[in-house]
Amino acid sequence: MKNSYRNLGTSLLTLGLVGCFEVPDQDHLVTAAGIVPGVDCQKPPLVALASTALPREFGITVWNLYKGQRKNWREGLNEYAKSQDLVLLQESATRPEMLHWLRAGDFQWQQLQAFTQGGVSFGVMTVAKTPQAFVCGVRSPEPLLRIPKSGLVSLYPLQGDPDGVLVVNLHAVNFELGMATFREQLNDLTALIHRHQGPVILGGDFNTWSDKREFWLNKLVGELGLQEAIPVPDLRRTA
């Protein structure tokens, strides 16, 4: 069963959604093989015996695709993501152009379905050259809009490390008056990260548009012992 919503306010129109969209009432993963039910994030498997693994040094791209609404998004993927080992996308859309790009690159990929519209699935998507050993998702509904923001948790075998690398692709809660849901979402993912014994990558669109949000994120990152990865050269821009 799904929850159906129709856009009535200008705040929803800012999301670029027009018409009726549906929010699944359970977690679903979209893959090249089809839509499958989500699994329990508490029970990742052992990865030591995996036949293929990420190299010890690998490239990664993190990008909010804005539902493919901006010009030249495909050219951007070809330039910045096609040759990478890992690609963490937010606001991805399973339109034919995106699916063709994934097939052409022979990528392994999973998307945590936030909502659907017109047969297209939207949500965070993690793309890799190496098959994942485990993947699960955590959704957090926006308090005002009720559209989920998501964290996709993937475990990949890593050469020389029996625990593998845990990759968290996060699109953080954005539209709320305070920070309660934002903090709860980060705390839920932090609990999963604490249980992993190997290396961790936390990336995505954190929506740290206020000093308080940035402070809270930095606090959790410090508690986890993570270090910020600065691109070289650093060509990032703010919207």
Language-model region placement:
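N-terminal, active-site-proximal structural segment of metallo-dependent hydrolase catalytic domains
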Residues: 2-12, 16-104, 116-120, 187
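Alpha-helical elements of Rossmann-like donor-binding domains used by nucleotide-donor carbohydrate transfer enzymes
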Residues: 75-76, 153, 184-188, 219
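Active site of divalent-metal-dependent phosphoester/diester hydrolases
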Residues: 27, 108-128, 147, 179, ...
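Proline-centered loop/turn at the N-terminus of a beta-strand
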Residues: 85, 108, 199-201, 227
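Catalytic metal-binding/acid-base residues of hydrolase active sites
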Residues: 66, 93, 171-173, 206-207
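His/acidic metal-ligating clusters that form di-metal
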Residues: 157-168, 178-208, 212-215
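Structured beta-strand-rich core segments of catalytic domains in phosphoester-bond hydrolases
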Residues: 27-45, 86, 90-166, 170-172
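Sec-exported extracytoplasmic/periplasmic mature domains
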Residues: 81-82, 103-104, 132, 194-198
